[in-house]
Amino acid sequence: MSKGRFTPLASLRRLLLRILVVLAVFWGGGIALFSVVPVPFSAVMVERQISAWLQGDFGYVAHSDWAGMDAISPWMGLAVIAAEDQKFPEHWGFDVSAIEKALAHNERNENRIRGASTLSQQTAKNLFLWDGRSWLRKGLEAGLTVGLETVWSKKRILTVYLNIAEFGDGVFGVEAASQRYFNKPASRLSMSEAALLAAVLPNPLRFKANAPSGYVRSRQAWILRQMRQLGGESFMTRNHLY
């Protein structure tokens, strides 16, 4: 009798373990595969597409065109590093000082939460996980980030990030964004245009690259200053990112 009472719990544990094993194999395989193969779509793209269909919007298309780093202007990589993660070449996936500052800020300003995700974390989240905030998702994100940093080069992480980042409603990846907003390939983006695209990244569904608000213009100017302070294009070659 005693053994029977514990059977449902044991079965649940076995089921959860099997699910975790399947997910680990799936994500591990994805990390290995996408270290060399172009990424056709991300979890965020799938989530956006399904959400649109469920709302009856059958005209929505989550669009992305893969571009290798040699087909992307070096200004674009520099712009997202300047805007999102200036220690990207140095850290192993996590910026401890940025996390500490974000925690201190969030304790003082509970209504204005600040994140501290690195480009590596954002790539892991956008590629493999669902949108939202939870300790479970953050834990999975941390594990996937370690996987990316272990298997991929920094250049590969940046390349995938630029190809799956959301730049507007249905616009994913810098090639699609460059064509949509500037009618040119990503390889021809100027320093100013790259900074403008990077300026909308905190909230690409609210901020518009084709109709920039005063805040977006101000952020663009700040990013341009940071790009110059980092050393311009030489920063990319010096850190083997281009």
UniProtKB/Swiss-Prot annotation:
Cellular component terms per the entry's GO annotation: peptidoglycan-based cell wall; plasma membrane
Membrane topology recorded in Swiss-Prot or TrEMBL: Single-pass membrane protein
EC number: 2.4.99.28
Family matches, as InterPro entries: Glyco_trans_51 (IPR001264), Lysozyme-like_dom_sf (IPR023346), PBP_transglycosylase (IPR036950), Pep_trsgly (IPR011812)
Pathway in which this enzyme or protein is active: Cell wall biogenesis; peptidoglycan biosynthesis
This protein's record includes keyword Cell inner membrane: yes
One matching Pfam family: Transgly
UniProt KW keywords: Cell inner membrane, Cell membrane, Cell shape, Cell wall biogenesis/degradation, Glycosyltransferase, Membrane, Peptidoglycan synthesis, Transferase, Transmembrane, Transmembrane helix
Catalysis performed (reactions): [GlcNAc-(1->4)-Mur2Ac(oyl-L-Ala-gamma-D-Glu-L-Lys-D-Ala-D-Ala)](n)-di-trans,octa-cis-undecaprenyl diphosphate + beta-D-GlcNAc-(1->4)-Mur2Ac(oyl-L-Ala-gamma-D-Glu-L-Lys-D-Ala-D-Ala)-di-trans,octa-cis-undecaprenyl diphosphate = [GlcNAc-(1->4)-Mur2Ac(oyl-L-Ala-gamma-D-Glu-L-Lys-D-Ala-D-Ala)](n+1)-di-trans,octa-cis-undecaprenyl diphosphate + di-trans,octa-cis-undecaprenyl diphosphate + H(+)
GO BP: cell wall organization; peptidoglycan biosynthetic process; regulation of cell shape
The protein's name in its UniProt record: Biosynthetic peptidoglycan transglycosylase
